[in-house]
């Protein structure tokens, strides 16, 4: 019988993406900081909306 040498690929070859924990330069924000920042920006936008009377 003929011997079949099957080559198997790693899991990433099957469409699964592997992410590595490489430290990169830049700002590191926690999810809590992102939520608080979003709320602050929203409040500033709402305050500007009610304090300006240009075309409204």
From Swiss-Prot:
Residues 1-30 are cytoplasmic. The chain crosses the membrane at residues 31-52. GO terms for cellular component: plasma membrane. The keyword rRNA-binding does not apply. The keyword Membrane applies. Belongs to the SEC61-beta family. It comes from Methanosphaera stadtmanae (strain ATCC 43021 / DSM 3091 / JCM 11832 / MCB-3). InterPro entries: Preprot_translocase_SecG, SecG/Sec61-beta/Sbh. It is found in: Cell membrane. It is a single-pass membrane protein. Component of the protein translocase complex. Heterotrimer consisting of alpha (SecY), beta (SecG) and gamma (SecE) subunits. Can form oligomers of the heterotrimer. Involved in protein export. The function of the beta subunit is unknown, but it may be involved in stabilization of the trimeric complex. Residues 53-56 are extracellular. One of its GO terms (biological process) is protein transport. This is Preprotein translocase subunit SecG. Keywords: Cell membrane, Membrane, Protein transport, Translocation, Transmembrane, Transmembrane helix, Transport. It holds the Pfam family Sec61_beta.
């Amino acid at each position: 019988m003929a011997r079949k040498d099957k080559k198997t690929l790693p899991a990433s070859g099957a469409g699964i993406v592997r992410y590595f924990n490489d430290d990169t330069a830049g700002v590191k924000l926690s999810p809590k900081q992102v939520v608080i920042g979003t709320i602050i920006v929203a409040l500033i936008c709402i305050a500007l909306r009610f304090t300006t009377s240009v075309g409204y």
